[in-house]
Amino acid sequence: MSEPTVTSTPRPWSQRFEGSLHPAIARFNASIGFDIRLLPYDVAGSLAHVQMLAACGILTQQEADQIRWGLEQIQQEAAAGTFRPDPEAEDVHYAVERRLVALVGEVGKKLHTGRSRNDQVATDLRLYLRDQIDHLRQALWELRGVLLDLAERHLETILPGYTHLQRAQPISLAHHLLAYEEMFWRDWQRLGRVREEVNVCPLGSGALAGTSLPIDRQLTAHLLGFERISANSLDAVSDRDYLVEFHAAASLILVHLSRLSEEVILWASQEFGFVTLTDACATGSSLMPQKKNPDVPELVRGKAGRVFGHLQALLVTLKGLPLAYNKDLQEDKEGLFDTVDTLKACLEAMTLLLREGIQFQPERMAAAVQEDFSNATDVADYLVRKGIPFRTAHDLVGQIVRICLAEGILLRDLPLERWKTFHPAFEADILTAIEPRQVVATRLSAGGTGFAVVREALQRAQARHQQPEPSEETPQT
């Protein structure tokens, strides 16, 4: 099919006006600089729309075939990176339409029958975000897999657990790693729920009131893989709740990534020494030749604030908008695109860091457990098992710790005879009860850090990690 020569058409609304738009205002008004990212989704929506128009008899089959051919050409250009939007096009929708008319002639102007850019952009956004959520869930799945592999390798490794960044109780490293796997498991589930909210088709809602043409919205939704159609046309074109929910879910993921990053940064310091950074995932200093800097987790931690800002910006944009569509909603895209890009990059970087960028130091972790009073709670528990009220036991152990600090010794340095001077309930087994490995092993309550409990928790996490994705759809890009 040859390309007919067609004269350039004005903006889709320009016939209402006598004068021309000031170039500065045209630049200010345009979104083509960033919404061009929606091109494959805009074309996909148009292909479904034209198929529906033909099925409903609004277009002839010949017209639909011509338009479909043109849209497929645009798809190929986009895939090859050769699509160049018309300089006069103010947004991706009109860029597609102008290129279509250039390819197929006047029949291309029939594509926009029965729809508005308002329901069109709402559809594009949902298609885009549904696709990106699938990619992000896959990235979370990979990160969880790395954490599970590390946990399996470190079931027997112990280290201090912290509260208030003070050593608290000995725990297993696997237990610590599985705590993050739990967070990212919740994130994976949460994104799945957001996807359900995204998977609603607004196409056919028109500018705000629907259309008088006999369209079939259910058919369009089916062709685009949507679960259902929107119920109210006013709400459909102005609803951005699903974007807020996505930004909130993304922010939570970055909270978890940032917390993990903070711990890697601390653990890589000489003050902790629990991990060392490999050359593949660290940088140096331009001045201090001895430095090895944890730039990757620092950047993840820093980028979290950027994503939080996009959530707040969207909420502020939406809070004062009357129904239905307002131009303010053009501002929903750049933050969304940046959040998606940033989150993808952070997940990829953290997965790589955990897989190849850090080496745990079990000996240093074990030594740190021996250097403190993190077994003090177990002395109190020992007395409780002897029938002494916990509060009484707690007070007594606090006094023992104070005495040890004054003498510059640890609990493990106390001989049995000294223990007995504190309370007659202490017997020879107190010496083994406060050994770090024994302390960890006895934490057998559900969800605890006991070796046996953690092994069972790991098996459950591995089993759910092997479950198939609830969505079998293949991402478009």
UniProtKB/Swiss-Prot annotation:
Protein name, as recorded: Argininosuccinate lyase
Compartments where located: Cytoplasm
Listed HAMAP family: Arg_succ_lyase
GO BP of this protein: arginine biosynthetic process via ornithine; L-arginine biosynthetic process
Pathway named in the protein's UniProt entry: Amino-acid biosynthesis; L-arginine biosynthesis; L-arginine from L-ornithine and carbamoyl phosphate: step 3/3
Keyword Protein biosynthesis: no
UniProt main location, coarse: cytoplasm
